[in-house]
Regions:
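Active-site-adjacent helical/loop segments in soluble small-molecule enzymes
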Residues: 37-97
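A generic, residue-level signal for flexible/boundary positions that often mark functional hotspots
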Residues: 2, 6, 25, 47-50, ...
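Phosphate-binding loop/pocket of nucleotide- and phosphate-handling active sites
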Residues: 20-25, 84-148
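Short, low-complexity, polar/charged sequence segments that are solvent-exposed and flexible
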Residues: 16-20, 50, 72-75, 122-125
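Electropositive phosphate-/nucleotide-binding environments in soluble metabolic enzymes
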Residues: 2, 6, 21, 25, ...
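Short glycine/serine/threonine-biased micro-segments
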Residues: 28, 32, 71, 78, ...
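Glycine-rich phosphate/pyrophosphate-binding loop at beta-loop-alpha junctions
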Residues: 1-48, 112-113, 117
Length: 148
């Protein structure tokens, strides 16, 4: 969950089987549910499966979005940034080993939440729709040392 709205992760870390509703404050709007209807079941399923759960800051959400874009070419929305951010956190904590097979479901695209990453990556720019313009722009990015 995003730290600005993490009632389930907070309860899990505290070892509780119930959560306290919160007022959401996060860039991950699609996950900003302060009183999740299935929160109890999420806690129960995580405990029964000996799973793990955590929360990430909005900055870590943006870093997750950037990491996925740079490594896989996927522009995820903020919920996907939460998924990747928490995945990275669980790896750092040793709860997921670097060689473990792990699947991260990223179902929303970043076009829905562009405003969340504008400060970190800059505003998108437009080119005229042609292969020549694309190739020229792509080459400029490579020559400037930018990621293309």
């Amino acid at each position: 969950q995003a730290e600005g709205c993490s009632p389930i992760a907070t309860a899990f870390k505290a070892g509780r089987d119930f959560f306290k509703p919160v007022k959401p404050k996060t860039i991950a709007k699609s996950l900003a549910i302060g009183n999740p209807a299935d929160g109890y079941y999420a806690l129960k399923a995580t405990a029964e499966s000996k799973g793990a759960m955590d929360a990430v800051t909005d900055e870590e959400v943006v870093e997750g979005i950037k990491l996925l874009a740079q490594t896989e070419g996927i522009f995820a929305e903020t919920a996907g940034g939460v998924t990747i951010g928490v995945l990275c956190k669980l790896v750092k904590q040793g709860l997921i080993k670097k060689n473990d097979v792990t699947v991260a479901y990223i179902t929303g695209n970043g076009l829905k939440t562009q405003e969340a990453v504008v400060d970190a990556v800059g505003r998108p720019f437009r080119i005229q729709p042609s292969l020549v313009n694309f190739q020229k722009t792509f080459k400029m990015g490579k020559n400037s040392g930018g990621e293309s």
